[in-house]
Amino acid sequence: MVERLSAEARASALRDLSGWAELDGREAISRTFTFRDFNEAFGFMTRVALIAEKRDHHPEWRNVYRTVEVVLATHDAGGVTMLDIELARAMDAIAAAISG
């Protein structure tokens, strides 16, 4: 089982993740991605889903038109782990590739 990150480790990791923040009232990180249109948003979700399935680590997310709201936490660990940080980095890279 992966270990939950300390508050200091979470803060350090978040400094390198643009747009990500700790979620109020819960040990999780969140970000809202905004794309040009629904097709880009859905394409982002599809690409992330393939990575998430391969890693067996899935986001909580919500899509409305061109936005995708994401929450990451590792339920088995009761908080944020390196699995979440790594998935956040992958999401950032995918979003950057789509937005060009």
From Swiss-Prot:
Catalytic activity: (4aS,6R)-4a-hydroxy-L-erythro-5,6,7,8-tetrahydrobiopterin = (6R)-L-erythro-6,7-dihydrobiopterin + H2O
Protein name: Putative pterin-4-alpha-carbinolamine dehydratase
GO BP: tetrahydrobiopterin biosynthetic process
Keyword Heme attributed: no
The entry's keywords: Lyase
HAMAP family: Pterin_4_alpha
Family: Belongs to the pterin-4-alpha-carbinolamine dehydratase family.
PANTHER family listed in its UniProt record: PTERIN-4-ALPHA-CARBINOLAMINE DEHYDRATASE
Taxonomy of the source species: Bacteria, Pseudomonadati, Pseudomonadota, Alphaproteobacteria, Hyphomicrobiales
A GO term for molecular function: 4-alpha-hydroxytetrahydrobiopterin dehydratase activity
